[in-house]
Amino acid sequence: MKRDYYEILGVARNATPEEIKKAYRKLARKYHPDVNKDDPNAAEKFKEINEAYEVLSDPEKRARYDQFGHAGVDGNFAGQGGFGGGAGINFEDIFSGFGGFGDLFDMVFGSGRKARQGPVPGDDIEAVLELTLEEAVFGGEKELRVTRTETCGHCHGNGAEPGTPIITCPTCQGRGQIHQEVKTLFGRMVRSQVCSTCRGEGKIPKTPCRECGGSGLVRKTRSITVKIPPGIDHGHRLRIAGGGEAGRFGGPPGDLYVYIKIKPHKLFKREDIHLKLEKEISFVQAALGAKVEIPTIDGGTEILEIPEGTQTGTVFTIKGKGVPVVNGSGRGNLYVTVKVVTPTKLTERQKQLLREFEEISKQKEETFKEKFNKFKNKFAL
């Protein structure tokens, strides 16, 4: 038994056309055979989804379905019901020869004369956009070159050379499907399949378009403007609706997914919303303390006070000079790690001063030891 069309698309019976279209696009993209090549059930699910959408997206067919159920839209209903074994009989041929009865048959049971494929959404495509750290931090707009399938502008997608007619397919005589009589255990049956010449359309261009060869589609490389939100990070993905491949049979285009790649920076390293920087200071600055200029991602500088006695590896925080929160407020911090640089080339005067410094340090250490020993001996038992 066929599943309910509303159930297939996951929508309520009073769903709006927009809700039905949205549900269809999501499911069609999920179960498209090209995306699920390893899933043997994907093609059948995709066919089921298209069948449901073809009925529910058409106001007339939807009304018949709501009133009669599947019988109101199933063109094979008469052949499956109580009209006999159907040996060698094609009911649509019978009813089509009786004028108004053919129209009545179509109205009640749906026309099986066309195997036209339902609207097929275009495929999604992916691209990589490389940014500098500054571009990622502050956002903006950047151009991206993308190659994709588009509707042919020369023939506007109908596949015919402008000024030439669209004719009835000579293979299927406009039915969109080919009928073959086959022998089965139950007698002779009529089997239908989509016409390969017109792909179920029932019509073909008399003179194929010189630009697209009759397919209605062409490959184009376009420059697309991508809006970069401030604070975007490496690996983030941006979705550009309708930026993908063109749809077929009136289907909507797919989407473009842009993956962000951030170039390494010569000064800063990023961790989430924070930036890190290593700053070299001299031995004297570390020992005596100093005020040093720290570059920021904004392009300016901040004054950092180095207290006397600072050791290598000490981390200082400059608040609010990191990365903005994506789609939020506030910024991270800039963490500065100091590295005390030991001098490698000293003058004799500098060496002498360091020796004097070392001697004074030793004297202080010896004086401290003497005082400590006297204190210890005084209270010794």
Swiss-Prot record:
Zn(2+) 1 binds at residues 152, 155, 209, 212. The gene is dnaJ. GO terms for biological process: chaperone cofactor-dependent protein refolding; DNA replication; protein refolding; response to heat. GO terms for cellular component: cytoplasm. Gene3D superfamilies: DnaJ domain, Heat shock protein DnaJ, cysteine-rich domain, Urease metallochaperone UreE, N-terminal domain. CXXCXGXG motif repeats lie at residues 152-159, 169-176, 195-202, 209-216. It comes from the Bacteria. This is Chaperone protein DnaJ. It comes from Carboxydothermus hydrogenoformans (strain ATCC BAA-161 / DSM 6008 / Z-2901). Keywords: Chaperone, Cytoplasm, DNA replication, Metal-binding, Repeat, Stress response, Zinc, Zinc-finger. A zinc finger (CR-type) spans 139-221. Participates actively in the response to hyperosmotic and heat shock by preventing the aggregation of stress-denatured proteins and by disaggregating proteins, also in an autonomous, DnaK-independent fashion. Unfolded proteins bind initially to DnaJ; upon interaction with the DnaJ-bound protein, DnaK hydrolyzes its bound ATP, resulting in the formation of a stable complex. GrpE releases ADP from DnaK; ATP binding to DnaK triggers the release of the substrate protein, thus completing the reaction cycle. The keyword Zinc-finger applies. Binds 2 Zn(2+) ions per monomer.
